[in-house]
Structure formats: structure tokens, C-alpha cells
């Protein structure tokens, strides 16, 4: 029994030392996966030239998967990532706002499901770094490349046909986060703030068959709250 206890203690010590060596290495690699919630900052919303002031938003839980490289300099680090992200969001509004003859219970909706590759680069600092435990904060810019052929846009109960929205192919944001690590496992909490309007416009066809831009306007910035769990290789 004493031999087994001693062996277990040695293995635990070796595991901790290995984990610490990984954390103290000049370069680390890792993966993480998590969930996010999109919160749009709506800049302008109108239908048939009528400003929409009453609406409800619905942010569905989205998911992402990330691979990263971290360059360490004592308590400081710089991290680059490549992430595949799927974000879901919809907005619902009473139809009577632009159509007085509609039923009071009628609702119209715009839904988006945007797929994309995200490439952030940020600076981090370890607030606490002791043994196998640590805590850090980080911030930096992020670029998102929209994969339009995998994305989906839906328009329900709106007074136009053939509605098509164009999302900017590249969108930029700032990210702030807090990370907690236990040995090689870590947890990240982050807030992403969109820097600009992600919509390039919505084209639609009216009852006379005329296609035009501006019948529907849905200008917004994209903000994101996210949580992830990762493993440092």
C-alpha cells in the first residue's frame, strides 16, 4: 500500500510539472469549443419607409470551434485563432406598424443564420499564475469572414417578394475576455463588440414587380457573449 501511495504521489507530481512546463513554454497550441449568444445593436429598422419602434429580439444559442496558437512572454501572451462560428438571431415585430389593416396579432419576422470563419488576435496578461492554476484577461481585434453560401436569411409576413439581404463579407469587432485555467484545461468568458453595421442592404420586389433597395432596412452591429472550454496541447 505504501508503495502504491508513493507511486501515485510521484505520478501526480510529474503530471503537475509537465502541465507547468507546457504553460511556461514559449509557444502553446490548443483547441476550444463553446456557445455564444448574439445581441444586435439595431441602428435602423424600417419596413415600407415606416420606422419600426416596437419589436422583440430572439437570440438562439450558437456554437463555435477554435484552434489557436499562443506565444508566451512571462506573464504576457499574444494569441492567434481560427474559429468556425454559427450565429442565429431573429427579430419579431407587429405587422400593424406599417399595415394598419393587418390583424392586431399579426407578426412579421426577420431571421439570420450566419456561418463564418473568425480570425482574432489579442494580447493577454496573467493576473494570477501559480502552479497549475491561473487567471488572465485579454483583448484585441477580430475579423469575421462570412460564408454566404452556408448562411441563411428568412423574411416572414413582409409586403415584398424575392427578399435578399447582403451581409458585408468581412466584419470587424473588438473582443474582451477573462480566462481561468486549471492545469491544461481552461475556461474563457468573452464579450465581442461590433465596430460597424454588418448589413450592406436588402433588395426586394414590390407588387408591381419592381426590384429596389431600401424597402426594408435592417442596419445593426453585432455584439456577442460567449463561453468556451478548451485544452492546451
Kindly label every feature range from the protein language model.
Residues 1-32, 178, 225-233:
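Bacterial Sec-dependent N-terminal signal peptides
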Residues 19-66, 232:
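Short glycine/proline- and aromatic-enriched beta-strand/turn motifs that initiate or cap beta-hairpins
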Residues 23-29, 74-78, 115-117, 131-137, ...:
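Outer-envelope beta-barrel architecture signal
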Residues 31-35, 63-73, 82-84, 119-125, ...:
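Residues on the lipid-exposed face of transmembrane beta-strands in outer-membrane beta-barrel proteins
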Residues 38-60, 87-116, 144-175, 196-226:
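Extracellular/periplasm-exposed beta-strand and loop segments of Gram-negative cell-envelope proteins
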Residues 126-130:
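Juxtamembrane helix-break-helix junctions at the cytosolic face
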Amino acid at each position: 500500500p505504501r508503495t502504491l501511495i508513493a507511486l501515485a504521489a510521484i505520478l501526480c507530481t510529474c503530471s503537475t510539472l509537465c502541465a507547468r512546463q507546457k504553460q511556461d513554454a514559449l509557444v502553446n497550441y490548443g483547441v476550444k469549443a463553446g456557445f455564444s449568444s448574439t445581441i444586435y445593436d439595431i441602428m435602423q429598422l424600417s419596413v415600407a419607409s415606416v420606422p419600426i419602434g416596437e419589436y422583440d429580439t430572439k437570440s438562439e444559442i450558437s456554437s463555435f470551434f477554435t484552434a489557436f496558437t499562443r506565444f508566451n512572454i512571462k506573464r504576457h501572451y499574444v494569441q492567434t485563432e481560427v474559429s468556425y462560428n454559427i450565429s442565429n438571431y431573429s427579430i419579431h415585430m407587429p405587422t400593424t406598424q406599417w399595415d394598419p389593416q393587418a390583424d392586431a396579432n399579426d407578426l412579421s419576422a426577420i431571421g439570420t443564420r450566419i456561418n463564418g470563419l473568425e480570425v482574432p488576435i489579442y494580447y493577454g496578461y496573467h493576473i494570477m499564475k501559480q502552479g497549475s492554476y491561473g487567471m488572465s484577461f485579454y483583448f484585441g481585434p477580430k475579423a469575421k469572414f462570412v460564408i454566404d453560401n452556408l448562411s441563411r436569411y428568412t423574411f416572414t409576413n413582409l409586403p415584398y417578394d424575392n427578399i435578399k439581404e447582403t451581409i458585408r463579407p468581412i466584419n470587424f469587432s473588438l473582443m474582451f475576455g477573462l480566462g481561468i485555467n486549471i492545469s491544461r484545461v481552461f475556461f474563457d468568458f468573452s464579450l465581442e463588440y461590433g465596430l460597424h453595421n454588418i448589413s450592406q442592404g436588402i433588395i426586394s420586389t414590390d407588387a408591381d414587380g419592381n426590384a429596389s433597395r431600401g424597402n426594408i432596412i435592417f442596419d445593426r452591429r453585432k455584439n456577442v457573449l460567449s463561453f468556451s472550454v478548451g485544452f492546451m496541447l
